[in-house]
Design a protein with these regions (language model features):
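Surface-exposed beta-strand edges and their flanking turn/coil or helix-capping segments
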Residues: 124-125, 167, 252-254, 298, ...
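Aromatic-lined carbohydrate-binding/catalytic grooves of carbohydrate-active enzymes
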Residues: 188-336, 344-351, 357-362, 366-368
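Active-site-proximal substrate-binding groove within the catalytic cores of carbohydrate-active enzymes
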Residues: 94, 100, 104-106, 110-120, ...
């Protein structure tokens, strides 16, 4: 304790403003739960609260590293050559809401629940003879809500495997763990994913304003499927068609029906679906409920997401041009319209909705106000509806909030070799949710019909 001359009364102190922290021990005694409430003074707006600042630090001389679920998982080493400050937005470029630190073979875990949370991973040089090392890794946690919470757990001896196992228990308590065994009780068809060969052929390809071309007709894909069954002897497979929709791949969403006339129309697609399912395989179709093209018959600005300045949000540049982005709550109108019709026409037993598990959770402003938490809720609603309608459901990317509602993540394995100097890819997603969801590479890396032999 130290004494000092009393300060004059502060208007801020008198209004009881500030950030108030509360700590309590976790029930199992493994660590602490920390929560805060922020009360900014009148006329002030809360930007962020940083309850952890350069915390859980570890040194190069302590064999230190950080375990972070960037995509499938990554380790950063304290003795890495590069200095950096990496910012991870929860469920943006970050697949699970935790981070781990290891020091001399002893591990700690921090985890949280709010998507409006950002983790900073710092790697800095220390220029001091008293520091005990020359390089330091540390974490900072920033939150933007007026209240928030996180947990810190001491795990004892261990590394990233023990960190993932400890987080599995926390994820289970949040209701995020839904295993294949549990899913199979409601839909036995999910077991057809086990060991299945996966293929995603395109059919109709069209750039905006062009006539386009048919890369494979439904009849040609019927011959491919027959070859896989009769000659190669596939006992299980997942065939998902891209470009089957009315105007071809990535064109005029959300107006997908009828099936591409150039590829064989509704009749040809229905026949292919029946054939593939009769082999005992999974047959799926590629769809999208994020992008809305302004040349689509259903286009209307009332469905769009908006920036703070009132301009509609736009997506990337795809075959159909640059789409606008639909607000996830508004997009459900088209999912409720389209998916029952697709089920009645083609009876797929699997479905793929692009981008849903891949793009960061987004914020939309007036006139369509949507928070990150709201965006997550409606994307979970979309995935759950597709799963209930067709049985097996998958999407691009992979993130833990989707685990109860999705059966496979396409693309997360494509990140397995993308490690920069001073880091290493590790299977954190597989360790936490490996018995809940199948992990696949991106469609561009899958078997093609030209190489099926």
């Amino acid at each position: 304790k130290a004494s000092a001359p009393p300060l004059p009364p502060s208007p801020i102190m008198m209004q009881r403003t500030g950030t108030f922290m509360h700590f309590e021990q976790l029930p199992d005694g493994s660590g602490i739960s920390a929560s805060y409430t922020a009360a900014p003074a009148d006329g002030w707006t809360l930007t962020s609260v940083t309850p952890l600042d350069h915390a859980l630090w570890t040194l190069d001389t302590e064999n230190g590293y950080a375990a972070v679920p960037e995509s499938i998982g990554k380790l950063y080493y304290a003795d890495g050559s590069e200095q950096f400050n990496k910012v991870y937005q929860t469920y943006g470029n970050y697949s699970m809401a935790f981070a781990g630190a290891v020091k001399d073979g002893s591990a700690m875990l921090i985890d949280w629940t709010e998507p409006d949370t950002a983790l900073n991973v710092h790697h800095s040089r220390i220029d001091s003879p008293y520091a005990g090392g020359s390089d330091q890794l540390s974490f900072s946690l920033s939150m933007t809500q007026r209240s928030g919470a996180f947990q810190m757990r001491v795990l004892g001896k261990g590394g990233y495997v023990q960190i993932a196992k400890a987080y599995r228990a926390a994820a289970s308590a949040r209701g995020l763990v839904r295993t294949f065994a549990q899913k199979a009780q409601e839909n036995p068809g999910v077991t057809k994913l086990y060991g299945a060969a996966t293929a995603k052929p395109d059919t109709m390809i069209r750039s905006r304003g062009s006539a386009g071309y048919t890369s494979h007709t439904f009849a040609e894909l019927s011959q491919v499927a027959q070859h896989w069954n009769d000659v190669l002897g596939f006992d299980r497979a997942l065939m998902t068609l891209g470009g089957w929709i009315r105007m071809g791949f990535d064109n005029q969403y959300p107006d997908i029906l009828p099936a591409s006339p150039e590829a064989g129309g509704n009749e040809g697609l229905a026949a292919l679906s029946t054939q593939v399912r009769d082999y005992g395989w999974l047959f799926g179709l590629h769809d999208n409920y994020q992008d809305m093209y302004d040349d689509a018959p259903s286009f209307d600005t009332k469905y769009l997401m908006y920036n703070k300045d009132g301009r509609p949000q736009t997506g990337g540049v795809w075959a159909g041009g640059t789409p606008y982005l639909m607000a996830s709550d508004k997009a459900m109108e088209f999912a409720y319209r389209n998916l029952p019709q697709v089920k009645d026409l083609f009876s797929p037993n699997s479905y793929f909705i692009d981008t849903t598990f891949n793009v960061p959770l987004a914020v939309s402003y007036a006139p369509n106000v949507l928070s990150r938490s709201g965006d997550m809720h409606w994307k979970q609603t979309l995935a759950g509806y597709a799963q209930d309608t067709f049985g097996v459901f998958g999407s691009e990317g992979g993130v833990e909030w989707a685990v109860p509602y999705g059966d496979y993540f396409e693309g997360i394995l494509s990140k397995k070799t993308q490690a920069e100097p001073g880091s290493h890819i590790v299977p954190l997603m597989e360790l936490v949710y490996g018995d809940c969801v199948a992990l696949y590479p991106h469609m561009s890396e899958k078997i093609g019909t030209n190489g099926y032999n």
